[in-house]
């Protein structure tokens, strides 16, 4: 199993902090950044190789990851056009490194409880984190469920059949390769600023993806300072206090 860590975004909604480092290097507490915590969880489930997409501050991120001495081999894939494209292009750039194994894919601003990573790694089918205990968020991903499978993921996906979702994925190799094929089609025809999930939505019937309900456990993105305060407080209360 290989990890895909998406870190090519600018993180402008974080304000002044991301003018000095990538968003994934925002601190959760005095022990961990977002990405150092992700790396610890990946090692926890036996991942030994990770593809890291980069945008601004690529050298700083590389230095940070290598300083962790995590026992993971990192492959860095830059997106030179990160200012004008979305991570659909970053994923397309990395496709050659992601064809041979099952994939755990995380957005670089995602904070997870250890149990959520354990659930992802153990999932026998391609899965995405959802939380049916939460109200549907306005600004974050929702997943539409059809016949027990995920049929659409997006910010503007609403309805009674939808649940709150986060971009934490476990993909079987064949399913991930099919998604990447559709991503390639999108990029080739110039759809370079949309979410990669748009490509999944276009081919969902051929990509069996199932909801993995995290049941209220921490699984949340940090998009802005308000998110950071809330998620860090939850991290300290529900994760760090148990360590």
Spans of features found by a protein language model:
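Conserved beta-loop-beta/alpha segment of the NTase-like Rossmann-fold superfamily
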Residues: 69-141
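N-terminal nucleotide-binding beta1-loop-alpha1 segment
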Residues: 1-19
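Short catalytic helix/loop segments, enriched in acidic residues and glycine
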Residues: 20-36
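Conserved N-terminal catalytic core of the sugar/cofactor nucleotidyltransferase
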Residues: 2-5, 32-101
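Conserved core of the sugar-phosphate nucleotidyltransferase
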Residues: 113-190
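A structural signal for short hydrophobic beta-strand segments in well-ordered beta-sheet cores
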Residues: 25, 143-145, 211
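Conserved alpha/beta core of the MobA/IspD/sugar-nucleotide pyrophosphorylase nucleotidyltransferase superfamily
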Residues: 1-3, 164-243
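Phosphate- and divalent-cation-binding pockets in alpha/beta enzyme and binding domains
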Residues: 13, 60-63, 115, 221, ...
């Amino acid at each position: 199993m290989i990890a895909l860590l998406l870190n090519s975004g600018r993180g402008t909604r974080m304000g002044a902090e991301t003018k000095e480092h990538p968003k994934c290097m925002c601190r959760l507490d005095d022990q961990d950044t977002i990405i150092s915590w992700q790396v610890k969880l990946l090692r926890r489930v036996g991942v030994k190789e990770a593809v890291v997409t980069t945008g601004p501050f690529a050298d700083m991120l590389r230095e940070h990851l290598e300083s962790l001495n995590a026992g993971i081999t990192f492959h860095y894939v830059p997106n030179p056009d990160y200012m004008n494209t979305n991570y659909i292009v970053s994923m397309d750039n990395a496709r050659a490194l992601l064809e041979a194994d099952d994939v755990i894919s995380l957005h670089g601003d995602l904070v997870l409880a250890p149990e959520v990573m354990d659930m992802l790694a153990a999932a026998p089918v391609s899965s995405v984190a959802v939380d049916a205990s939460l109200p549907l968020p306005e600004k974050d991903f929702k997943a539409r469920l059809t016949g027990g499978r995920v049929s659409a993921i997006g910010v503007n996906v609403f309805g009674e059949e939808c649940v709150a979702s986060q971009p934490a994925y476990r993909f079987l190799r064949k399913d991930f390769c099919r998604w990447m094929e559709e991503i390639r089609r999108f990029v080739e025809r110039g759809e370079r600023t949309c979410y990669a999930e748009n490509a999944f939505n276009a081919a969902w019937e051929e990509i069996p993806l199932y909801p993995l309900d995290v049941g209220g456990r921490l699984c949340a993105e940090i998009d802005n300072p308000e998110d950071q305060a809330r998620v860090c407080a939850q991290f300290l209360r529900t994760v760090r206090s148990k360590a």
